């Protein structure tokens, strides 16, 4: 029988079960060991029978139905992925699509006609980056705008700008990034953003400004290579062609700018015009926007008018103003860019930050949990015992610039032909796993802690990497023994029904975990390490080191270091095992059950190796239970009645786990059910409410939500490479729109 992780036993024992729901249960596939004499390394790409993109049934789905999940697992070969980087002094040669290339800092270069289009990118060997020499940066609080508290609303003016920051240790070059900051204070621009502190039932109004312009007011090019063959914002298409998948007569080079943005408050209970809808983007107010370019997305004007009608404020060009009612449970939220077809690149460039909602009946009284957290106006040197931790993976070039693939060849070695000769996009990679771990904008930082309790708010901000976090006394020993447990008290939707003791945290992309870590009694001078036992590849499930190779212990298997210092403050917080968490009001019964599908489409071209993935898709199921794959532009199929409570069944026909995020709602995880098995209750850390859930391969994941804001929203996979290439769908609450786009 397979082994499954049991979170109920503090000694980290394992329960034997055929149908256990944990992500540490049986793996959907067996992998060959990674061979990485020097990174980067390309393992064998997944090869499957050719399937047509328009076909509603993928080969993986057919195999699961015909053979059963376990047999399909054995027969479906895993694709390979590449961990970016190269040995010190070496160069990584990457091809440019159609002879046009994007240089590391976003400038364009076009070799002569007929040129191969390859150029050297010197990448930074992650093993040469010193670890634990830089102190962890604890994000300060974002300052409010002047006169911000008029009418009982906290107001902010926050822009996205380009700047240089020391992400790598000081002995190495700085990195050009994008990030949020208060337009009234240049010192607040940072990666990740300063934190927005909000109070339950007190509105927050933010004017989000696209300030990606230079000192002369000209638009800045993108830092990374943008693939214009996806279904994306497409400003060059003009108003008629925006938010579309363009057609080409020859393989295009990368789009470099101007760059559209739109900010989404992830986990917010938002109205449609303030949700950061992916087609409500806007360009900077630059003085050199090319003639004929669309300057806003398809929904921008409609939402601008709606916001004006509701709040008496019309958005200025290059901006959007959103208002958040904060009428939800105290919780850990975050904000990030959400532009159609560009999310993976815009967020990788830096724009993201925490939004912490406090107060109300669903919070704990002051002093019950470790504190303080950062507050506006804190004196320098203030010690914090509540700390948000944004964990991300990044790769770098030797000049300190960000590395992200500029060609599809990076993923699986397929060097073309690309669109339009085949259906393979020239730049987009199905997933990307970087080679360096970054916490709060610093590579492998260290934090001195007192021997007392700390409240840590974890966010998995990676593009594609699932994290399995553990606190160990060795940075490299695998398997690692837990040295200090986590007490998880909350997730995306606020506090759990009761604290849960865990030896490790499984966090999918965009998931959050609110935990208490108790360093009480640990001797001064002790060094402890936050390590990652997730994989350097797509996650399915299974025991680390058994079902899949753990992350490289020398690089991506290490996250940060804790050094226990002297006790200098009194800890009056309640021990986690004695905490009584706020009561949770469960949702009522559902009136509708929707059957939804998750699939992967492979290339249909005879010029492309069989099994080459070209899209990930959401959709529905037909009467026989077969997936009906739908693209972003297909008609809306999810249309809950206003104030209806519905159950959504996520049928995963792929061999990967997908973190599914539904905008506007906080949902309950009802259960999971293998395709040929019985329902399994949710994990203890998934109780209460969530906004992102792991849909495991070969299973039905059921969630239940109440849809109480009318309008247009989206649901999608939060592996952002998937999201950017069709694994996102619009949904409509409260009937049809007066007009569609």
Regions found by a protein language model. Give the residues of each.
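C-terminal substrate/ligand-recognition segments
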Residues: 595-669, 691-719
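Divalent metal-coordination and catalytic microenvironments
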Residues: 158, 206, 337, 389, ...
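N-terminal secretory signal peptides
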Residues: 3-5, 9, 14, 20, ...
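Extracellular/periplasmic metallocenter environments
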Residues: 240-365, 497-562, 654-658, 683-741
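Active/binding-pocket-proximal capping segment
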Residues: 473-493, 653-687, 720-723, 732-737
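Asparagine-centered strand-capping/turn motif at beta-strand->loop junctions
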Residues: 208-212, 460-462, 650-654
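Histidine- and aromatic-rich segments of cupredoxin/plastocyanin-like copper-binding domains
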Residues: 270-287, 295, 391, 395, ...
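N-terminal, post-signal-peptide metal-ligating segments of extracellular/periplasmic oxidoreductases
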Residues: 59-60, 64-73, 78, 83-91, ...
């Amino acid at each position: 029988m397979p082994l499954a992780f049991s979170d109920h036993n503090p000694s980290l024992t394992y329960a034997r079960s055929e149908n256990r729901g944990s992500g540490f249960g049986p793996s959907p596939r067996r992998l060959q060991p990674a061979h990485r004499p020097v990174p980067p390394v390309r393992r064998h790409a997944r090869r499957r029978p050719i399937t047509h993109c328009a076909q509603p049934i993928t080969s993986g789905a057919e195999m699961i139905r015909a053979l059963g999940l376990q047999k399909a697992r054995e027969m479906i070969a895993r694709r390979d992925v590449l961990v970016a980087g190269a040995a010190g002094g070496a160069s990584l040669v990457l091809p440019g699509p159609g002879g046009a290339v994007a240089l590391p800092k976003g400038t364009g270069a076009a070799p002569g006609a007929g040129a191969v289009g390859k150029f050297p990118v010197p990448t930074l060997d992650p093993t040469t980056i010193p670890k634990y020499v830089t102190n962890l940066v604890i994000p300060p609080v974002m300052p409010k705008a002047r006169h911000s508290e008029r009418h009982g609303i906290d107001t902010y003016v926050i822009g996205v700008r380009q700047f240089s920051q020391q992400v790598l240790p000081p002995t190495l070059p700085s990195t050009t990034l994008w990030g949020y900051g208060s337009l009234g204070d240049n010192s607040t621009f940072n990666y990740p953003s300063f934190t927005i502190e909000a109070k339950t039932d007190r509105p927050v109004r933010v004017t989000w400004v696209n300030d990606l312009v230079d000192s002369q007011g000209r638009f800045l090019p993108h830092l990374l290579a943008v693939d214009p063959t996806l279904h994306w914002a497409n400003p060059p298409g003009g108003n008629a062609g925006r938010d579309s998948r363009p057609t080409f007569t020859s393989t295009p080079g990368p789009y470099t700018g101007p760059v559209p943005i739109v900010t989404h408050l992830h986990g917010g209970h938002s109205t449609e015009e303030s949700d950061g809808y992916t087609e409500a983007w806007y360009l900077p107010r630059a003085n050199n926007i090319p003639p004929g370019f669309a300057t806003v997305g398809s929904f921008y004007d409609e939402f601008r008018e709606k916001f004006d009608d509701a709040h008496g404020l019309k958005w200025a060009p290059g901006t959007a103003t959103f208002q958040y009612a904060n009428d939800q449970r105290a919780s850990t939220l975050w904000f990030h860019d959400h532009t159609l077809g560009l999310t993976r690149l815009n967020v990788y460039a830096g724009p993201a930050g925490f939004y912490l909602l406090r107060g109300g009946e669903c919070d704990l009284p002051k002093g019950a949990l470790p504190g303080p957290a950062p507050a506006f106006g804190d004196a320098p040197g203030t010690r914090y015992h509540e700390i948000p931790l944004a964990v991300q993976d990044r790769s770098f070039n030797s000049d300190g610039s960000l590395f992200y693939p500029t060609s599809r060849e990076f993923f699986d070695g397929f060097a073309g032909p690309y669109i339009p000769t085949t259906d393979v996009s020239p730049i987009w990679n199905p997933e990307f796993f970087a080679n360096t771990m970054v916490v709060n904008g610093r590579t492998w930082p260290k934090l001195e802690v007192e021997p007392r309790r700390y409240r840590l708010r974890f966010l998995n901000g990676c593009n594609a990497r699932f994290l399995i976090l553990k606190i160990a006394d060795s940075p490299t020993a695998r398997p690692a023994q837990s040295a200090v447990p986590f007490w998880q008290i909350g997730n995306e939707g606020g506090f759990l029904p009761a604290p849960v003791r865990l030896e490790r945290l499984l966090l999918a992309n965009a998931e959050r975990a609110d935990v208490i870590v108790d360093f009480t009694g640990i001797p001064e001078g002790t060094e402890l390490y936050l390590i990652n036992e997730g994989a350097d590849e797509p996650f399915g499930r299974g025991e680390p080191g058994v079902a899949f190779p753990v992350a490289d212990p020398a690089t991506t298997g290490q996250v940060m270091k804790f050094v226990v210092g002297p006790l200098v403050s009194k800890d009056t917080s309640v021990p986690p095992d004695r905490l009584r968490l706020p009561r949770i009001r469960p949702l009522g019964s559902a009136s509708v059950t929707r059957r939804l599908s998750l699939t992967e489409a492979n290339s249909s071209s005879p010029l492309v190796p069989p099994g080459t993935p070209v899209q990930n898709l959401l959709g529905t199921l037909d009467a026989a239970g077969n997936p009906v794959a739908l693209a972003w532009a297909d008609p809306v199929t999810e249309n809950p009645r206003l104030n209806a409570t519905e159950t959504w069944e996520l049928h995963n026909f792929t061999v990967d786990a997908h973190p599914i995020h539904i905008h506007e709602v906080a949902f309950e995880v009802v259960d999971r059910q293998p395709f040929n098995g019985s329902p399994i209750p949710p994990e203890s850390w998934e109780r209460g409410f969530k906004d992102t859930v792991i849909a495991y391969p070969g299973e039905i994941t059921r969630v239940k939500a109440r849809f109480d804001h009318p309008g247009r929203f989206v649901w999608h996979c939060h592996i952002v490479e998937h999201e950017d290439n069709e694994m996102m769908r619009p949904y409509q609450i409260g009937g049809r729109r007066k007009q569609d786009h």
